[in-house]
Amino acid sequence: MKPNPKLIFEQPNIENTIPLSVYQASSPEKFSIEDDDKLVMHAGGSGYKISILRNDPTQEVKVHEDFQSMENSSVSLFVLNTCVIIWLDEIQKGLELPYQSISLSALQSNNDHQALYLQVLSNDYISSIPTEPTEYTSTVELIITKEKDIPESMVNRLFESMVSDIHGLYNGLSTCSAFHYDSDSDEENGDNTNGFYGMDFQDSDTNAPALEIPSSWIDDEGHDHDIAIKNIGDADDLELDEEELQRVRDESGTPVAGMNVDVGYASIVGSIRKRGEDDMGEFNKSRKLI
C-alpha cells in the first residue's frame, strides 16, 4: 500500500532537517541512504505560486477547505528525501505529498520564465472527479512558478544556504523520486516478481508454482511395473568390484541395492567392517575416522 498525502501543521526546520550539502559533507559514505535521525532537503525555497489546471471539462477539481487559499497564497516548497511539502505561509499549514503520489513531473518554459509541472494522484485534499465514466487514473495538474521573494524575516533558515529556483526543484524532485519504489505500478502491469521490495516469506509455499511432471513418467493402473530391489545385506559394498556385483545381479534376477564409489587415488581412512566380524571384539577398532 502506497502512503497517502496528509495535512501537516509544522514545516521542516533546522532541528529535524539538514540541507543535502551538509549531509554529504558529514556522511559521504552514506550518500543517498535515508538518514534515521533527520530529513535531508535536496531542494526548496519560498515565494512560489501554485496554479491548479482546470482545462478538462470532463473532470471536476475539488480542493479541501484547508487549502482553498492555495492558489492565492505564497507557498514554500520542501523537496525532502521522503516527500514533497507544500507549505502555505499565510495559514501555517502544509500538504505532504509522498513521491508515490506524484505520477509525473516536468519543466515548462514560457519565454524567459520556467514552471514546474506536476501530476498528482487524486487524494483527500486535492481531487479530480470525472463527470463521466473513464478508464484512466484520476490526477490533478499543478503548475508551480516563482512569484516573488518574501521578507528575510519570514524565510525558513533552511533556505539560507540553498539556491532556490524552478530548475533546482525539478532536479531534486527527480533524484528523490528514484529512491522510492512504487509497487502498485508493477501489480497493475502484472509484473509482481516478489523481488527485493516485495518478498513475502509466509506465502512462499502457497504461491510456489506447481511442479510440471511429464505424462510419460506417470504409469496408469494397467501398466504398473513394480521393480523389486533386493537388499543383500551388504550396506558397505565398497569392497565389491563390478564383476562381483554383476554376478550377484545375474544370480538373483533382481536389481541389487549397492554402491559403487570411485575414489580415484585417494585412500580411505579407517577400516570397513565385514559381516562376519565380531561386533563386540572389533567395536573399538572399526570405522575410526580422522
From Swiss-Prot:
One Gene Ontology CC term in the entry: pICln-Sm protein complex
Ranges that cross the membrane: none
Stated family: Belongs to the LOT5 family.
Protein name (database record): Protein LOT5
The species this protein was found in: Debaryomyces hansenii (strain ATCC 36239 / CBS 767 / BCRC 21394 / JCM 1990 / NBRC 0083 / IGC 2968)
Subcellular location field: Cytoplasm; Nucleus
InterPro entries (alphabetical): ICln/Lot5/Saf5, PH-like_dom_sf
Pfam families referenced in this protein's UniProt entry, alphabetically: Voldacs (PF03517)
Single GO BP term: mRNA cis splicing, via spliceosome
UniProt KW keywords: Cytoplasm, Nucleus
First-listed, main subcellular location of the protein, grouped into a coarse class: cytoplasm
